[in-house]
Amino acid sequence: MLKIADTTFTSRLFTGTGKFSSPELMLEALRASGSQLITMAMKRVDLQSGNDAILAPLRQLGVRLLPNTSGAKTAEEAIFAARLAREALNTHWVKLEVHPDVRYLLPDPIETLKAAEVLVKEGFVVLPYCGADPVLCKRLEEVGCAAVMPLGSPIGSNLGLRTRDFLQIIIEQSKVPVVVDAGIGAPSHALEALELGADAVLVNTAIAVAHSPVQMAHAFRLAVESGERARLAGLGASPFNPSQPDTLQLRATATSPLTGFLSQLEEQDHV
């Protein structure tokens, strides 16, 4: 179970709504994912329509909607978008995104922190998308963010956990949930994040652009469940599991030592 603010989730796979070829396919894939937290860009929602093509089907799912401030280039724009979402959708949850760089969509750390401080004071449950910067994530936690969402790699890149070392530091020191967001392009990436100790992952592009989004959504669901189970079971020491540095050994260890067996053979030879 994962608790963020006042809500408990049984699924650690959060999903997005962009890039699907149709609202119907989006809805089917989201159902297959088992996701209970779904993010949506306010800039893509027709707030004047009571039957918006994106919003209406999402409300059928009975999940928590997480409006995001994608498109905001400054703290002020993000704050305005968050307030608009609260009024339009009757939610105080917001995924805070401030990325003025239109090419790489990298989050602006200064503007993100500024906006987070204001929104937290206004009673929002703030989940900020941010760079994999341990210092920034700690500052966001200190101003009251309910979780932090550091990137694995640039949005939509499908490159996986290119920031792994920094993610590990963030996970180790964080007192709020860590949700790896952006760049997760395969179920194996999601599994890796959960094994590393992340509390959840957010996936959009890898599901939406797959040949079969529904099957891919289900694959991510299984990967996240497997990653969490593996972490809870206790991963053995290896260079890929730095959570056990004291037991790390860069040499082979036989699972079935031959010492006793060879000794018996030597004794038989002498008989």
UniProtKB/Swiss-Prot annotation:
The protein's name: Thiazole synthase
UniProt organism field: Yersinia pestis
EC number annotated for this UniProt entry: 2.8.1.10
UniProt entry tagged with the keyword Cytoplasm: yes
Oligomer and partners: Homotetramer. Forms heterodimers with either ThiH or ThiS.
UniProt-listed InterPro entries: Aldolase_TIM, Thiazole_synthase_ThiG, ThiG
Keywords per UniProt: Cytoplasm, Schiff base, Thiamine biosynthesis, Transferase
Active site per UniProt: K95 (schiff-base intermediate with dxp)
Pathway(s) annotated for this protein in UniProt: Cofactor biosynthesis; thiamine diphosphate biosynthesis
Biological processes annotated in GO: thiamine biosynthetic process; thiamine diphosphate biosynthetic process
Lineage top rank: taxon: Bacteria
GO MF annotation, one: thiazole synthase activity
Task performed by this protein: Catalyzes the rearrangement of 1-deoxy-D-xylulose 5-phosphate (DXP) to produce the thiazole phosphate moiety of thiamine. Sulfur is provided by the thiocarboxylate moiety of the carrier protein ThiS. In vitro, sulfur can be provided by H(2)S.
GO cellular component, one term: 2-iminoacetate synthase complex
Annotated binding of 1-deoxy-D-xylulose 5-phosphate, by residue: G156, A182, G183, N204, T205
Compartments, record wording: Cytoplasm
Principal localisation: cytoplasm
Protein family membership: Belongs to the ThiG family.
